[in-house]
From Swiss-Prot:
Disulfide bonds join C3-C16, C11-C28, C18-C33, C27-C38. It is found in: Secreted. This is Mu-conotoxin-like Cal 12.1.1e. It comes from Californiconus californicus. The cysteine framework is XII (C-C-C-C-CC-C-C). The lineage of its organism: Eukaryota, Metazoa, Spiralia, Lophotrochozoa, Mollusca. GO terms for molecular function: ion channel regulator activity; toxin activity. The modification 4-hydroxyproline is found at P23, P39.
Length: 44
């Protein structure tokens, strides 16, 4: 699934969160979370 919800500057969906200002860019793409760009998950 695609990360499509912005919460507090982070994109959160399906257990992942993505920092739009991360060094490698936004880890969310049309295919979902690009896990190797994500700094962590909301479960951490």
């Amino acid at each position: 699934d695609v990360c499509d919800s912005l919460v507090g500057g982070h994109c959160i969906h399906n257990g992942c969160w993505c920092d739009q200002d991360a060094p490698h860019g936004n880890c969310c793409d049309t295919g979902g979370c690009v896990w190797w760009w994500c700094p962590g998950t909301k479960w951490d």
